[in-house]
Amino acid sequence: MKQNQKLLLLCGDSYQDISLLAAVNEAQKLNAKDGNALVLYLGEENAITQEAADIVVVSKLKLDALRTTLLSYTGSRLLLAFADKQILNLLFRLEETGFFKDASIMIVGPSLQRYRTFYQQADQRRLFQELDYQVPASALVSSVREAIEFSEGIQFPIMIWPVASKQGQGRKIAHNLDDLCEAVEMGLSVSPSQQCLLEFSTYGFKELDFVVMRDREDNHYLAASIESIDPVGIHSSDSYQFMPAVTLTDREFQNLREAAIHISRYLKLTGAISIKFALDPTSYAFYILEVNPFASDSISMASMGLGYSLFEQGVQLQLGRSLEHLPHPLLQDLKAVYEPSLDYIFFKIPIFSDAAQNARLNTQIHSYGAVYGLGKRIDEAYQQALETIKDKKLLTVFPEEMSDDELIQKIARHMPHRLFYILEALKRGFEFEELLDLSKLSPIYLQVLANLVELEKGVEAETSPAFLPVEPSAGLYEVKAGAAYYLTQNGTNESFGLDAACVLVDDLEIRYPSFYQKVRKKVQELKEKGQQVILVTNRPFTESLADKVYYLPINETSLNLIQSIDQVKDIVKLSNIQ
């Protein structure tokens, strides 16, 4: 292959730079195997592109800029696993001029023609109808007047989707005509085609993400089911979430699993595909909200919760590898097609800046990141994530200092960190039914919080802390070296000690995604010195970096527990002041 003939991982701007981080991570792995990969990032220079300048090429998100950059890499291959709809729009326009044929540039993975079939929300709706799935009543509008006409034949609330906007910018739920006019006007301004899709809102339905892995030979498996505690109407990045989904009936789960796999196969997508559902809590009816074949926070969360990278596996599948031939990344003597079965809960708590504390949560993203916890039960996983929040002093609101009226407002208006307000209300003796009505939470989730309050009141139970592997077989198979471990309060330890190991403590700020590169470089630096490295972190993308990973709150108790298992030679702490 000539020097300018590369595998280009095309990548755009995304929430918490998930796409860029994942692309850089995978390019580094490919190049370690002589993959000749580069990341082509369409966006502005930032700390991540500067840290990884040797493998990242930066270009403007403009047609002419992309064309000029690609001409420097004639004969190369383009991989779109980390792209987005705005990038697709530019690629469609280049394809229409015959650019890729003239430049001998090949798209690997699904073709552009395949992406065209569901590029717009309206296209996705037609596909879902072809597959006999329910779709909400909708209309594609190009003016506020058209939006008003549509609203006359449908009940509020109405969902507004600006067509192909950046990171879903401009998505809104209109509860009345004034909301609608304002939202459509803004949506038209951020849509490249100056169009908005309006549809009946599934506001208040249960929201779930199912992640499917599929190869070009049609081998596939369900990698993850992620359940949002907050209902449809609050962006999933701002919602408390956990995996696997555990509050569904078997019929509900099988219906959604079958639909997710059916859609992925029908569209002939390869790699990692996230399908977002809205489930009617009063029936078995469900709606498909979105099909996303690109890098997303759902795939990032699923990767951390499984203990191995779905991004890495997805890239291999788009490059033509088969799930039946790829070795499982974590489990001994198994192939990658193995479908996960988890015996633990992985819980996410979103984190908000001071400026966002009084925001009313909706379909726009307000959080800047998240912390995670694992446990045998939802309450144990939640408490571990909460411990990280306390250790890092990430919570800057104090529910215990608020009046009852303030708590009610915070809960009813869907404001950031509202689970903390609900917990405080439960401690004060608010009635269960009253909180159900205020919060609109599922009774199951509210009961979990009520259980936490009761546990705090009770006598502290005797515990037997144990480290268990983050792995997808519920303990049926042996895990490979480099696995991640979590802490449960009762169990039999399965973390076998390392000798003369260096413990690297990742105490860096969560809000800056670029700090992942600092962690990676420090691990490499220590390993080049011949040291075995144990990484303690609460950050995604850290799988397989070190000889062992612990997903733990970073405090003295955690470090003491590690030292009771592993022979620690040294402790190195990465902190913000370095």
Show where each model-derived region lies.
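ATP-dependent carboxylate activation and anion-phosphoryl transfer catalytic cores
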Residues: 2-65, 69-74, 97, 131-132, ...
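Non-catalytic terminal/interface segments that mediate subunit docking, oligomerization
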Residues: 5, 16-17, 24-29, 38-40, ...
